[in-house]
Amino acid sequence: MTDTPPPSPIAATGAIATPPFEGPLADARDQRFMRAALEEARLAEAAGEVPVGAVVVWNDAIIARGHNLPIRSRDPSAHAEMQALRAAAQVIGNYRMPECELYVTLEPCAMCSGAMLHARLRHVVFGATDPKTGAAGSVLDLFAEARLNHQTTIRGGVLADECGQLLRDFFRARRRAQKADRAGGQAVTEPGNGSVTEPSSDPQGKPDA
């Protein structure tokens, strides 16, 4: 489900590489859209997926939503950001989105960061950092790579505690369930373990090695 999109289509070129808002109004606005991304993250959690959610915003309206689905879809590319970008491209009729912003509850990985740059997003906002696979400053910073032909501005740490706590609670519950299974002599087959502070190589769904 999406909010009512703006009436006119987005141009294919003319990316804007400056933050759309600054100051206290930006904080309130970013929190509003991050809370929408958190709603998506909770949908992922309810489906047994690692709780990461994303929304795409255009002209102050949410035009697309997505949450983590790699386990159920058996698709390693089905991260929340990719789901939201695919949905947004269908809404606007173009894979280029230079007037759009993306909000995601976890720092994007290299795959998702690359897709955002290919889409020529105007601005990206994330919640919790990912010290193992984050590609917006934690492990590497694709958004600061001046050799790329497009630069997307990025801001992190919006509702970071809330976004991070959702992930920590999820993995804590999963570890308890795994211990209970082992105590009962049952093999644990469900993939996707890790945490924000101690993540696996892919906190969005890849099994631990």
Residue ranges and their predicted role:
Residues 1-44, 111, 115-209:
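Zinc-dependent deaminase
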Residues 37, 41-44, 54, 64, ...:
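Small-residue (primarily alanine) positions within well-ordered alpha-helices
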Residues 48-52, 96-98:
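Short, basic and Ser/Thr-rich N-terminal targeting/leader segments
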Residues 52-60:
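Short beta-strand scaffold segments in enzyme catalytic cores
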Residues 63-70:
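Short beta->alpha transition motifs characteristic of CBS
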Residues 70, 104, 128:
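Residues that line or immediately flank small-molecule/substrate-binding pockets and catalytic motifs
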Residues 72-82:
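A short, polar/charged loop-to-alpha-helix boundary motif
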Residues 94-107:
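Immediate flanking context of iron-sulfur cluster ligation sites
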